[in-house]
């Protein structure tokens, strides 16, 4: 432990200090334009949702939304709780394919989250030097991973087109570039080495897709027929085992 502290943790703390001090440059005007674009789309969706429902209501109110969807519009699959119908994402996602209003509501929720958390939230952290100086936390997570707060710059969206656009407001200083480097499934490779699991070792030696292999076995599906969703779920299981699922 002393060796780990002296040779890894202490040198890393200096690097994190330099990263916090340097910060990351943000294009304030582009961030504002991004927020404005979100507002335009949010307003479009709000109008669309109200028209489909036949009345105006507070889309952000779970109680009102539940009553509109499951009582006024008669959608099937509603789950009633003590406080009203559940409008949790997992409930609505099951209804979205057959009910356009539900798909619009899910998009509305996603965009309002982007607006409040990123378009508005990040703007509050831009300092006089035009940079955001996040805090990197070295000793908070149980897994030993570094976390980021005020704001969290390690969780910038990338799954949707609008989500990815937020990344474009972060820019390097003149004559510099951003680079991206990531170990390929490092935790599972370490697990293969420590455990000595022959199948896992062979999978990595042959450059096989370990997540697709797991999905194939878990879902009893031929390897070639594994869907992207099944692979993502298997990936969560694989890494979950490493982190104590």
Regions found by a protein language model. Give the residues of each.
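Conserved "right-hand" nucleotidyltransferase catalytic core of DNA-directed polymerases
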Residues: 1-161, 177, 184-187, 216, ...
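Short, polar/flexible loop-turn hinges at active-site or ligand-entry regions and domain interfaces
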Residues: 1-2, 198-204, 222-226
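Conserved, non-catalytic sequence blocks in retroelement Pol enzymes and Pol-derived host proteins
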Residues: 59-60, 203-205
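A short acidic-Thr-Gly-centered motif at the start of a beta-strand
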Residues: 162-177
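Residue-level signal for well-ordered alpha-helical positions
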Residues: 169, 193-194
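ATPase nucleotide-binding head domains, primarily ABC-like/P-loop NTPase cores
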Residues: 180, 188-193
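Generic long, charged, amphipathic alpha-helical segments
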Residues: 206-233
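A short, glycine-centered helix-capping/turn motif at helix boundaries
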Residues: 243-245
